[in-house]
A protein has these predicted regions:
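Alpha-helical linker/edge segments of TPR/alpha-solenoid repeat scaffolds
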Residues: 50, 80-90, 130-141
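Terminal, low-structured helical/coil segments at or just beyond the last alpha-helical repeat
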Residues: 94-141
Length: 141
C-alpha cells in the first residue's frame, strides 16, 4: 500500500516515469499482484506508454478474467493504444461480467464489423457471440 501511495504522489507531482519505475521494481518481486499491476498500468498510461500498459493489462486479464475492473481498464487502454477492435472485445467482456448480455453482443457486433478482413479475429468474435447466445439460453431455462 505504501508503494502505491508513493507512486500516486509521483503521479500527482508530474513524475509518471518515477511512479512506473517504483511499481515495476515491486512487481518484479511480487509478480501478478493485482493492485500493483493496475497501478503500474495506470503509471504507464500517464507516462505516455499505452502499448506497454496494454501489454500489462492483457496479461493481467488472463490471470483475473472474472474481474470487471480489469476489463474496463483494458478497454480504455486499448482505445488509447489505437486497438479499436480490442476496445469492443474488452467492453464485451466487461458487460458479460456485469450481466448485460445485449450490450456485450452489441460490442462484439462492432468488433465483427471492423474485423471483416481478419479471419482469425472474425472467428474468435463469432465464437464469443455464440457463447453469449448460449448464456442467454441458459438463463431462460
Amino acid at each position: 500500500a505504501f508503494v502505491i501511495a508513493a507512486a500516486d504522489i509521483d503521479l500527482a507531482a508530474g513524475k509518471p516515469q518515477a511512479a512506473a519505475l517504483r511499481l515495476r521494481a515491486l512487481l518484479d518481486v511480487n509478480p501478478g499482484n493485482h493492485p500493483l499491476t493496475m497501478a503500474y498500468a495506470n503509471a504507464l498510461l500517464r507516462n505516455g506508454r499505452p502499448k506497454d500498459a496494454q501489454r500489462v493489462l492483457v496479461e493481467h486479464s488472463r490471470r483475473k478474467p472474472d474481474d470487471p475492473q480489469v476489463w474496463y481498464e483494458l478497454a480504455e487502454t486499448h482505445g488509447l493504444a489505437g486497438s479499436i477492435i480490442d476496445v469492443h472485445r474488452a467492453r464485451a467482456e466487461y458487460f458479460i461480467l456485469n450481466g448485460a448480455l445485449d450490450l456485450a453482443e452489441r460490442q462484439l457486433g462492432y468488433a465483427l464489423d471492423l474485423a471483416r478482413s481478419d479471419f482469425h479475429t472474425t472467428a474468435s468474435v463469432q465464437a464469443r457471440i455464440a457463447d453469449i447466445r448460449e448464456m442467454r439460453e441458459e438463463i431462460k431455462l
